[in-house]
């Protein structure tokens, strides 16, 4: 039976893929990125393969691989590809599955459908990755509100970056959401360093609990 966890973020470039790699490795899970936009450099799937310690067979192929590094809706239009967002379904996997979105919740897959629309249909529990720098309180609380408005189950917030006790505390208090932990900035991002940092700062049992309401 598939046990999916959706990893999304408050913004792009905050370390969501690195976190997804750490989580997938810690849970000995499968990993899936439904849409990859931009394949010239290392793709997210390739990064997770490098950092998670998982065998290649655990990393499922993307539903769409787009050449252009842009929002999926625009990348698809430039590449001449039609994304059938309504047909995107969670793979049938026997065991845990980490699914990574792109950027934030309202990143468009098409001109009519955003990632949060897909997450609402899937009803899979979500981990919200948030940075710790200036502006994160507003971005994170808005993302929490958006998830709750669509009745999407939220496991909690995973902070990424340098310690910011006050911002983290305010988000947890006002957002009424569990703090899952904080992945610190790593001097060198390797599989071993990431595995150790995740084990020190997160409890894998927290990702297997029933989501907060």
Swiss-Prot record:
- Write the protein's name: ATP-dependent dethiobiotin synthetase BioD
Q: How does it assemble?
A: Homodimer.
Q: Which residues form the active site?
A: 33
Pathway per the UniProt entry? Cofactor biosynthesis; biotin biosynthesis; biotin from 7,8-diaminononanoate: step 1/2
Question: Which reaction(s) does its UniProt entry say it catalyses?
Answer: (7R,8S)-7,8-diammoniononanoate + CO2 + ATP = (4R,5S)-dethiobiotin + ADP + phosphate + 3 H(+)
Q: Which organism is it from?
A: Rhodopseudomonas palustris (strain HaA2)
EC numbers on record? 6.3.3.3
Q: Detail which positions bind Mg(2+).
A: 17, 100
Q: Indicate the family of this protein.
A: Belongs to the dethiobiotin synthetase family.
Biological process terms in GO annotation: biotin biosynthetic process
Report the function annotation for this chain: Catalyzes a mechanistically unusual reaction, the ATP-dependent insertion of CO2 between the N7 and N8 nitrogen atoms of 7,8-diaminopelargonic acid (DAPA, also called 7,8-diammoniononanoate) to form a ureido ring.
Q: InterPro entries given for it?
A: DTB_synth_BioD, P-loop_NTPase
The UniProt keyword set, sorted, is:
ATP-binding, Biotin biosynthesis, Cytoplasm, Ligase, Magnesium, Metal-binding, Nucleotide-binding
GO molecular function of the protein, one example?
Answer: ATP binding
Signal peptide range in chain numbering: none
**Cofactor(s) needed by this chain:** Mg(2+)
Q: Which GO terms describe its cellular component?
A: cytosol
Localization per record: Cytoplasm
| Residues annotated as binding ATP | 13-18, 100-103, 184-186
């Amino acid at each position: 039976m598939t046990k999916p966890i959706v990893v999304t973020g408050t913004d792009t470039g905050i370390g969501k893929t690195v976190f997804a790699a750490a989580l997938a490795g810690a849970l000995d899970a499968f990993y899936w990125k439904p849409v990859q936009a931009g394949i010239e450099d290392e793709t997210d799937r390739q990064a997770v393969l490098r950092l998670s310690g998982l065998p290649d067979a655990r990393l499922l192929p993307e539903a769409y691989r787009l050449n252009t590094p842009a929002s999926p809706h625009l990348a698809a239009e430039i590449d001449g590809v039609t994304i059938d967002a309504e047909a995107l379904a969670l793979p049938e996997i026997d065991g845990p599955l980490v699914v990574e979105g792109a950027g934030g919740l309202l990143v468009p897959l098409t001109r009519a459908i955003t990632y949060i629309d897909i997450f609402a249909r899937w009803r899979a529990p979500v981990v919200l990755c948030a940075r710790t720098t200036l502006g994160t309180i507003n971005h994170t609380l808005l993302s929490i509100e958006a998830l709750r408005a669509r009745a999407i189950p939220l496991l909690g917030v995973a902070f990424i970056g340098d310690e910011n006790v006050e911002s983290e505390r305010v988000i947890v208090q006002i957002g009424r959401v569990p703090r899952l932990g904080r992945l610190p900035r790593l001097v060198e991002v390797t599989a071993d360093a990431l595995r150790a940092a995740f084990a020190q700062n997160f409890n894998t049992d927290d990702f297997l609990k029933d989501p907060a309401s």
